[in-house]
Amino acid sequence: MHKVLKFLAMLAILVCASLHELHAQYDKDMFMMRGRHALSEGKYAQAIENFNVLSQLDTADYWTFFFRGIAKYNLGDLRGAKTDFDRSVRLNPIFTNGYHYRGITESRFGNYESALADLQKAIDLRPGYVGLYFSRGVTYFLAQQFDKAIKDFDRYIRKEPKDPSAYLNRGASYLFLGDTLKAVNDYNKAIKLDRFDPEGYVRRGRLYASQKMHDLAIEDMNKAIELDTSNTFAYFNRAIMYYEQEKYQDAMNDLNRVLEDEPGNALTLYNRGLISAQLGAYDDALNDMDRVLNINPENVLAYFNRASIFIEMGMYENALEDYDRAIGLYPDFAKAYMNRSYVKNLLGRYKDAKRDYDTAQKKVAEYRAKNVSDAGSFADTTRKYSSLLSLDAEFAKKDFDDELLQHRDID
């Protein structure tokens, strides 16, 4: 009898342990299912909550850290995402997806060497997955290695010939190499594959605009806006095209539309300020330049153009202060010296004006002696500093996600 009771007790312990183990496994499966569902629905904070619990239940599950990294990446927490991707590949050194997404994250940091190393590791582990070549092509593009980017997009297109995004990316690479014919052919192919994606029309429209084919460019932007009425990048580009055609009110309307959705868009504020000044609405122009400088107090061109607005308003001392700031930020700014000389002459400060004039001439001579071809240089006095700026302006690069192409998702 005693032996029977002992056996039953041991059996009960084993049953309880098994039930506990089953319950724990059920909990893990439940949190994984909830987390992945939230991830697929774009509910990234909710996904992280589930993966946080799961990471405590099982500290060795590399998928948990990987999926949590994906959620953090999509929320913009790139450092947190990288930490989780690091953890996933430490737990499983042959985990392709971990290297893939860590590489993508490194590229977002601008760490292209590390990014390419991770993507190469992923390719070595899984050479048949062409999505890796797409992602590496994007990284090569961001690293301005356009020839290599094209080769990777070629390889991807051979396997996935009906993916319009690959043609858009390869077209952008050709464009940066100056091959506009191949670029427009790729944009045409992308549009043919997906006539309802505004991105193809925006890119082709920008290419047409660069070739001064403004009617075709505006036609493409109109189509992009028809497909996506909230596409601020299309409105912004169409505004510049209208400006080139001297349709200033149409340009102003498009810039206003951008600012409805993105009131802190410095580049759009800057361009609207220039148009307002050109139309004689100096108070409005001054307000926009003030807002630009509140966003970025080291914006050289905003100081330069606000000074011009002050001159039109007869506020010469204010203009001098802004030219001083522009020159302080960029001492080789010949045009700023020239304009400051003009203002000092108006104020009767002739010796100082002559000194600025001489400095401007010296800067111009030095610049021309270098035979610099960069038309965007602040020292190039042939540039129209009162013209609208596109995305070549340093201070504007954060305003639009222009050529930052998307990597392939995990399969």
Where are these regions (language model features)?
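Alpha-helical tetratricopeptide repeat
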Residues: H2, E21-D411
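Bacterial N-terminal signal peptides
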Residues: L8-S18
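Bacterial N-terminal signal peptides that target proteins for export
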Residues: M1-A9
